[in-house]
C-alpha cells in the first residue's frame, strides 16, 4: 500500500518542469503520441547514483542522430535534470527511471518532421521498482513466439525507439499463452532476444548470447559480456538455435536485475 501511495505521488519532469503525476500530460499533437516518433532509455538508481549514465546518454544521442532529432540541450543539462528529479522525489535506491524524448509537437497529425512546431518533448518518469526477490526462486517462463525480430533496413532493432509494436506483438502472444515473457527469433530462425529483456544461456561452461544483429545492445548485456571476458569466462555473441537453448545448462535474462528462466 505504501509503495502504491509513493508511486501515485511522484513528480514527473516534463521539459524541465516538475509536475505531479496526476497533472502530468503531453499534447495530443506530440510526435510520440501520434507516431511513436522518439527514443528512450531505462535507467536504474542505486545509492543515489545512476550506473553507466554516460553510456545511456551516449546511446540516446546516437539514436537521436539516427532519427535526425535535435535534442535541444547538452548531455550535462539532461543529466542535471535527472538528478534534480530524483532529489525532488527523495529517491535514492530501488528506483527505475524512464527517460523519453520525442521529436516534439506537430501542427497536424502527419509524419513529416517538417510539420514539427516545437523543440523535443523530454519526459523523466522515476518510479520505485525494486527487483522481485521471488523471481530467481520461481524463474520466468518463456514462450517462443511467431513474431520475428526484423531487419535493420526495415526498422533497426538496435535503436531504442518508441515504436515498440514488434515487441508488443511478442508480449501479447506470450501472455495469451500463459507465459511471462516472449523468446523472439531473428528472420533466419536463430535466437535473438526476449520482448523486454536480453537472453543468455550457459552450455558446457560457455556463456552464449545472440549475435546482436537483431536486438538492442543493452548496457547490462554489454557489461555481462565484459565481466565474462575480464574473468576469463568463455563468452560468445553468436547465432544459435532453439535446440541449443533446450540443451542449455542455465538460461538467464536481465529484467530489473539478473533473473533465472525456469522454462522455455
Feature-to-residue mapping (PLM):
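Glycine- and Gly-Pro-enriched alpha-helical subdomains that act as flexible
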Residues: 183, 190-212, 217
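Conserved alpha/beta cores of soluble small-molecule-handling proteins
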Residues: 2-183, 187-188, 216, 221, ...
